[in-house]
């Protein structure tokens, strides 16, 4: 089980990223617009840098919903490979069966 503080920190980052997503996208689109003067683009870059680092989507870590494990998370299910194996072995994940040949 992961530390509760790590899980909460990641949840905080998700909320912050969602709330500032539109603002970041607008700034990025203006920065990449070649019709804007260089000085204005530079000021836009500085305003983007003023935003919180945690508002960037790249700071979000995929974590297992059950254990909080940060590695080996299967995106389709949102759980780690260990828990997926455990739950699918018991038949609790719909559509997944243990294969044998």
From Swiss-Prot:
| Segments of skewed composition (Basic residues) | 10-24
Annotated keywords: Ribonucleoprotein, Ribosomal protein, RNA-binding, rRNA-binding
Gene Ontology terms describing biological process: translation
Q: Which organism is it from?
A: Rickettsia bellii (strain OSU 85-389)
Q: Keyword 4Fe-4S, does the record have it?
A: no
Partners and quaternary state?
Part of the 30S ribosomal subunit. Contacts proteins S3 and S10.
Q: Kindly list the GO CC terms recorded for this protein.
A: cytoplasm; small ribosomal subunit
Question: Among its keywords, does the record have Chloroplast?
Answer: no
What is the documented function of this protein? Binds 16S rRNA, required for the assembly of 30S particles and may also be responsible for determining the conformation of the 16S rRNA at the A site.
Name the family the entry cites.
Belongs to the universal ribosomal protein uS14 family.
Gene name tied to this protein: rpsN
Record-linked InterPro entries? Ribosomal_uS14, Ribosomal_uS14_bac/plastid, Ribosomal_uS14_CS
GO MF annotations for this entry? Answer: rRNA binding; structural constituent of ribosome
| Sequence segments annotated as region (Disordered) | 1-24
Q: What is this protein called?
A: Small ribosomal subunit protein uS14
């Amino acid at each position: 089980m992961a530390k509760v503080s790590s899980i909460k920190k990641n949840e905080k980052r998700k909320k912050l990223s969602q709330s500032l997503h539109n603002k970041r996208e607008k700034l990025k689109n203006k920065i990449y617009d070649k019709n804007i003067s260089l000085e204005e683009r530079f000021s836009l870059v500085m305003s983007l840098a003023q935003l919180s680092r945690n508002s960037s989507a790249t700071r979000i870590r995929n974590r297992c919903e059950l254990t909080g494990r940060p590695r080996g998370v299967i995106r389709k299910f949102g759980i780690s490979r260990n828990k997926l194996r455990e739950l699918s072995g018991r038949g609790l994940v719909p559509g997944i069966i243990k294969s044998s040949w």
